[in-house]
């Protein structure tokens, strides 16, 4: 007679999954909003739209962390990639004026390492808490044979809400409007395939002091900056005509996504100093300047476009909220079919 098999024998540990849920409950609880009905653990999560909205529009976004995760595996650094995961989605929906309401995560692995997964999801909860977004649920998928030992993948899903009349589309952007840039916290979650290639080829001392007391390793793995609370504070007082979250495609490919076809964002390359991380990447990888602008955020994580008469006040308010804000340039008329972001 053959030996009796269990799910654990097949590589799936239900007890480990249950332990992870218990571990993350306190973190998730701290993120809750009054709109959330019920607790973690149900088949679905219930969220009501607040009565303060007359004509609410839901805005959704989904994203991952990309190959930055490979560095997390190699360096055994798992406590900040969850922040990256949240930031990539909530910053995206923020661009349309949405206040993030709730977030769900998907964590997939070959064998569940409970302490490591706890670190990851603790970071997700931290990102949610910092952006005022409720972590209402998720999926932990233990799939034997699907991932190498010690590796996992992440996906995140954010939903926010905005009054219909306040949806930011970029359609009102016009000639003479001012382009502001909010400083990034490093490479955020994009360009890491190139970063890893540069590190592999250059073989730098990752633990030597690199910038302002940080090592190169710390500079490379630094989490994506969350812009939610400062931008929402600005939206309470001013009209923001358009925003661009600078992600894959860098500055030159993301800003046009919010511009009317007859306009160009003319950005002065001297209006901000290229942070040391990007200086090193460009030099070590011998990366051409235009390739830098279309691959990395180059120190600008969010672009905000406002009327000229509001620019000083918006810049000041965002500065009071803790952001470093640069006046990058102006919106001008487009000539022919020229690219809609010009950095010079």
Curated annotation (Swiss-Prot):
<dbReference type="GO" id="GO:0046084">
    <property type="term" value="P:adenine biosynthetic process"/>
</dbReference>
<dbReference type="GO" id="GO:0004637">
    <property type="term" value="F:phosphoribosylamine-glycine ligase activity"/>
</dbReference>
<dbReference type="InterPro" id="IPR004733">
    <property type="entry name" value="PurM_cligase"/>
</dbReference>
<dbReference type="InterPro" id="IPR036676">
    <property type="entry name" value="PurM-like_C_sf"/>
</dbReference>
<dbReference type="InterPro" id="IPR036921">
    <property type="entry name" value="PurM-like_N_sf"/>
</dbReference>
<comment type="pathway">
    <text>Purine metabolism; IMP biosynthesis via de novo pathway; 5-amino-1-(5-phospho-D-ribosyl)imidazole from N(2)-formyl-N(1)-(5-phospho-D-ribosyl)glycinamide: step 2/2.</text>
</comment>
<dbReference type="Pfam" id="PF02769">
    <property type="entry name" value="AIRS_C"/>
</dbReference>
<keyword id="KW-0658">Purine biosynthesis</keyword>
<dbReference type="InterPro" id="IPR016188">
    <property type="entry name" value="PurM-like_N"/>
</dbReference>
<dbReference type="GO" id="GO:0005524">
    <property type="term" value="F:ATP binding"/>
</dbReference>
<protein>
    <recommendedName>
        <fullName>Phosphoribosylformylglycinamidine cyclo-ligase</fullName>
        <ecNumber>6.3.3.1</ecNumber>
    </recommendedName>
</protein>
<dbReference type="GO" id="GO:0006164">
    <property type="term" value="P:purine nucleotide biosynthetic process"/>
</dbReference>
<dbReference type="GO" id="GO:0004641">
    <property type="term" value="F:phosphoribosylformylglycinamidine cyclo-ligase activity"/>
</dbReference>
<dbReference type="GO" id="GO:0005829">
    <property type="term" value="C:cytosol"/>
</dbReference>
<keyword id="KW-0067">ATP-binding</keyword>
<keyword id="KW-0436">Ligase</keyword>
<dbReference type="InterPro" id="IPR010918">
    <property type="entry name" value="PurM-like_C_dom"/>
</dbReference>
<comment type="similarity">
    <text>Belongs to the AIR synthase family.</text>
</comment>
<dbReference type="GO" id="GO:0006189">
    <property type="term" value="P:'de novo' IMP biosynthetic process"/>
</dbReference>
<keyword id="KW-0547">Nucleotide-binding</keyword>
<keyword id="KW-0963">Cytoplasm</keyword>
<dbReference type="Pfam" id="PF00586">
    <property type="entry name" value="AIRS"/>
</dbReference>
């Amino acid at each position: 007679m053959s030996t009796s098999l269990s799910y654990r024998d097949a590589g799936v540990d239900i007890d480990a999954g249950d332990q992870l849920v218990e571990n993350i409950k306190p973190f998730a609880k701290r993120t809750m909003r009054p709109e959330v009905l019920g607790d973690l653990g149900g088949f679905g999560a219930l969220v009501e739209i607040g009565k303060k909205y007359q004509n609410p529009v839901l805005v959704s976004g989904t994203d991952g962390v990309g190959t930055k995760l490979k560095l997390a595996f190699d360096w055994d650094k798992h406590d900040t990639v969850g922040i990256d995961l949240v930031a990539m989605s909530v910053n995206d929906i923020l661009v349309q004026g949405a206040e993030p309401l709730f977030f769900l995560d998907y964590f997939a692995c070959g064998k569940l390492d409970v302490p490591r997964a706890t670190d990851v999801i603790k970071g997700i909860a931290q990102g949610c808490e910092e952006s005022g977004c409720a972590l209402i649920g998720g999926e932990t998928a233990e799939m034997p044979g699907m991932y190498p030992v010690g590796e996992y993948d992440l996906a995140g899903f954010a939903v926010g809400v905005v009054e219909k009349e306040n949806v930011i589309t970029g359609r009102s952007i016009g000639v003479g409007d001012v382009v502001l840039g909010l400083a990034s916290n490093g490479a955020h979650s994009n360009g890491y395939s190139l970063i890893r290639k540069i590190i592999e080829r250059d073989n730098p001392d990752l633990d030597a002091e690199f910038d302002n007391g940080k090592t190169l390793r710390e500079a490379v793995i630094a989490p994506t900056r969350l812009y939610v609370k400062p931008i929402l504070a600005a939206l309470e007082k001013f009209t923001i005509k358009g925003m661009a979250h600078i992600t894959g495609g860098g500055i030159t490919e993301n800003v046009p996504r919010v511009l009317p076809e007859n306009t160009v964002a003319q950005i002065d390359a001297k209006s901000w100093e290229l942070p040391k991380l990007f200086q090193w990447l460009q030099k070590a990888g011998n990366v051409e300047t235009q390739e830098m602008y279309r691959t990395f955020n180059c120190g600008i994580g969010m672009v905000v476009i406002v009327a000229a008469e509001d620019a000083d006040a918006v810049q000041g308010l965002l500065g009071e909220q803790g952001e470093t804000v640069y006046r990058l340039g102006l919106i001008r008329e487009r000539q022919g079919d020229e690219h809609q972001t010009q950095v010079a």
